Amino acid sequence: MGPQARTLHLLFLLLHALPKPVMLVGNSDFHLAGDYLLGGLFTLHANVKSVSHLSYLQVPKCNEYNMKVLGYNLMQAMRFAVEEINNCSSLLPGVLLGYEMVDVCYLSNNIQPGLYFLSQIDDFLPILKDYSQYRPQVVAVIGPDNSESAITVSNILSYFLVPQVTYSAITDKLRDKRRFPAMLRTVPSATHHIEAMVQLMVHFQWNWIVVLVSDDDYGRENSHLLSQRLTNTGDICIAFQEVLPVPEPNQAVRPEEQDQLDNILDKLRRTSARVVVIFSPELSLHNFFREVLRWNFTGFVWIASESWAIDPVLHNLTELRHTGTFLGVTIQRVSIPGFSQFRVRHDKPEYPMPNETSLRTTCNQDCDACMNITESFNNVLMLSGERVVYSVYSAVYAVAHTLHRLLHCNQVRCTKQIVYPWQLLREIWHVNFTLLGNQLFFDEQGDMPMLLDIIQWQWGLSQNPFQSIASYSPTETRLTYISNVSWYTPNNTVPISMCSKSCQPGQMKKPIGLHPCCFECVDCPPGTYLNRSVDEFNCLSCPGSMWSYKNNIACFKRRLAFLEWHEVPTIVVTILAALGFISTLAILLIFWRHFQTPMVRSAGGPMCFLMLVPLLLAFGMVPVYVGPPTVFSCFCRQAFFTVCFSVCLSCITVRSFQIVCVFKMARRLPSAYGFWMRYHGPYVFVAFITAVKVALVAGNMLATTINPIGRTDPDDPNIIILSCHPNYRNGLLFNTSMDLLLSVLGFSFAYVGKELPTNYNEAKFITLSMTFSFTSSISLCTFMSVHDGVLVTIMDLLVTVLNFLAIGLGYFGPKCYMILFYPERNTSAYFNSMIQGYTMRKS
C-alpha cells in the first residue's frame, strides 16, 4: 500500500470515527440548499493554540473560544454573494447555489470539515480505484482564512481535486502546484505583502526596525521572508526580533508569558528603533498591546501584517492612538453595494429545496452571539470598506462563473448536469470576468492579481478607521503614494527610525558592529569620490587624469601644466635664445670670413666650427622645451642638448690642453707632443668624449623610456604636470656631472696657461665660461633635488641657454671683438712678437 493509499485509508477511518451529521430542516446561516453546494471554512471563534483533539476523537467546540468579528463578517460575505448570484438573471439562470459553512476555530477544527465536505449525502466516502466519477457533497471549497489551516485542508481536498479558493492564506507554499494542485486564492502572496512593507519603509527612510512574530508557522514564515528580502537589499536592518507568547484560550496570562512580554517591552524601550513590524494573529496581540499601554509607550510606528491590519476588536482599544501611528498592509478596498445592510440582516432567505438535496448539520455550525456582536462593530466594519470581504465575494463569483461555463448557460437557462470537482478545477483556471470594475482571473500560480492597500488606523468619529494611504500593485511590484499620513507625533513630523543618520554627499559609511545600517560617516579624502550606486562603504580613487576635492561625489579633469608660450619665463628665455642664435650665427660668419687669420687659428681653427655648429643648432632647438612634451621633445632634452654641450666643453678643454702643450710640453716632451699632433689628438679627444656621452645617453634611454608622463603637482593636486619621464631627471643629473668634470678640466688647463703670451692666454675667458657653466650646473642639480613641476623645466631651459651663451660669448666674444675692432693685432707679425716676448721672459 502506497503512502497516498495509506493516507486515504486513515481519512476514511477518521470520517467514520467523527460525530455523525444530523438532519436539519430549513436554511440557516450555515446551510443553504441548492443544485450545487459550495463549502465554506471560516474562523468564527479563534483558538490560536492548535490542540490536537483527535487524540481522543472529539471535535472541539469552537463556541467555547473568543468570537472573531471579522470571521463572521467574511462568512456573511459568502452568504451575500450566493444570494446575489441566485437572484441574478444573467449568471447561472435557473440554477440555485447552496452552501455548507463550518467554523474552523482558526486552527483547531480543520480535518473534520474537510472530510465532511468530501463525504456524500449519506455520510459515505467509498474506497475506489478511480474517483473521477465520485461526487462529494460540495463542488468547491471557499477558505479557510489562515495558511496553516489552508495547507491542512488542501492536503485532504487535493486527493480528490476539489477546487479550494482561499481568501486570506498568503503563504508562498501554496504556489507549489505539484503539492497543491487544487489550491487557488484571491489574495496576493506573502512575497507581495512583504515587498509592500519594505517599499513603505524605504519611502520613509526607516532602516532600523524591530520585528515581533507569533510562535507559529505564520510568524516564522513571514519573518523569514522579510529577513530574506532585507538581506538581498541591505537597506533596512533588524535591531532585534522576538517571539510573542501565544495565550491559552479563555485563560489569564501565565507568569512565564508575562515575563516574556516584559522582556520584549524592556528591549523595545531601550532600542533606538521606532518602527515595529508585527506578524501575528490578532488574538495573540491583545495582551501585548495592553502591556504596551501599561508601559506608556509613545512615538512608535506599528506596521501590521494582513492578519490584524483591519481587526476591529484591536482597533476598539482607542487608547492605542497614544502609542504612535498604526500602519498596515491589507487587500484593496472595494465597496460591495448592499452588503453593509445584509451583514446585520436577521431574516433568512427562502428558496425551494431541491428534491435531491437533504440538509444536515455537523459540528461547529452555530454562533448564537455572532449577529449581536457584529452589530456592535457594524459602524467600524461599514466605514472600513469591504477589504477581505471582497476576496470572499470574488472567490464565490469565480466558482459561479466557472459553473456558468461548464453548464453551457445562456441568457435564460443552464443545462443542469452532474459537475465533478475535477471538471470545475480544470475550468476555473481559465475564468476571466469583471466584478465591480475589477478584471479578475487566476495566474499560473493560482493567485488573483488583487491590489494591496497601505492603511492607517484613525480614531476620529467621522473618519474611516482604516484609511488608505497608498496602493501596491503585485503586477508592477510598485508602491504608489496617494495621500499624506497623519502622524501621531509633535508637529505631525515623520518619525525617525535609523540606526545612523544618512551620510552627506561625499561621505562613506564606516560600519559599526554587524549591521550595515549602523555606521559612522567618514569624509572621502581628496583624490577620491563616493559613488553610492556602486559602493557606499568605500571611497573610489579618481583616475590618473582626474582629481577631486574632499567630500566629492565625482572627479573632474585636472588642469594640465606645462611650459607655455605666453608665460613670462618662456618669453624671456626665448629672447635670450634668439639673441644667442643670432650672435652665434654672426660669430660663425666672422670666423668663416677670417678663417686664415692668426686670431681664428689661435682660437682653434677648424675646431671653432666644431663648437659653433652645435651652439647654433642648440639655440635653434630651444622651442622643444615649450608646449606639451612629446617623445621628440623629450629626446631633444635628454640627448641632443647634452651632446651639443659636451662637444663644446670637450673642444674648449682640449683647446686649453693643446695651448699648454705647445708652450709647456713641446720642449720637455717633444716625442709626446709629436705623437699628440701626428694622430690628431684634439679631434680624437673630442670624438671620444662625444662617443662616451652618446653611449651614456643611449643607455639611459634604452634602460627606461623617453615617453612623456603626467605627474601630480605636489603643491596643488588639481594640476597634472606634463613632463618627460622621471628617468629624464636622473639622466640629466648624470650628464650634468660629466659636464662638470669637463668644466673642471678646462678650468685647470686654462689656469696652468695663465702666464702664456697674451694672444694665447685664454685663461680668463675660459675661466669665465667654465665657472659660469660649473655654477649653473650645480644650481640646476640643487634646484631639481628640491623642486618639481614646471619650474624644473623652466630652470633646465634657462641653464641650458645661459650655458650656451657663456660658451659662445665668453669664449668667442673677445676674439670677435679683436678681429673687428683691432685688426692690427690679428696679424702674424703681432703674434710672433708676442711669442718672442714670452720666450725672452722665460729665458
From Swiss-Prot:
GO biological process entries: positive regulation of cytokinesis; sensory perception of sweet taste
InterPro entries listed in its UniProt record: ANF_lig-bd_rcpt, GPCR_3, GPCR_3_9-Cys_dom, GPCR_3_9-Cys_sf, GPCR_3_C, GPCR_3_Ca_sens_rcpt-rel, GPCR_3_CS, Peripla_BP_I
Bilayer disposition of the protein: Multi-pass membrane protein
Residue intervals on the Extracellular side: 20-570, 628-642, 704-731, 786-789
Residue intervals annotated with topology Cytoplasmic: 592-606, 664-682, 753-764, 811-843
Main localization category: membrane
Compartments, as annotated in UniProt: Cell membrane
Gene Ontology CC terms, in alphabetical order: plasma membrane; receptor complex; sweet taste receptor complex
A GO molecular-function descriptor: G protein-coupled receptor activity
Leader peptide range in chain numbering: 1-19
Domain of life: Eukaryota
Alphabetical keyword list: Cell membrane, G-protein coupled receptor, Glycoprotein, Membrane, Receptor, Sensory transduction, Signal, Taste, Transducer, Transmembrane, Transmembrane helix
Tissue expression per record: Expressed mainly in circumvallate and foliate taste papillae.
Family to which the UniProt record says this protein belongs: Belongs to the G-protein coupled receptor 3 family. TAS1R subfamily.
Role noted for this protein: Putative taste receptor. TAS1R2/TAS1R3 recognizes diverse natural and synthetic sweeteners.
Self-association state and partner proteins as the record states: Forms heterodimers with TAS1R3.
Protein name as catalogued: Taste receptor type 1 member 2
Organism of derivation: Mus musculus (Mouse)
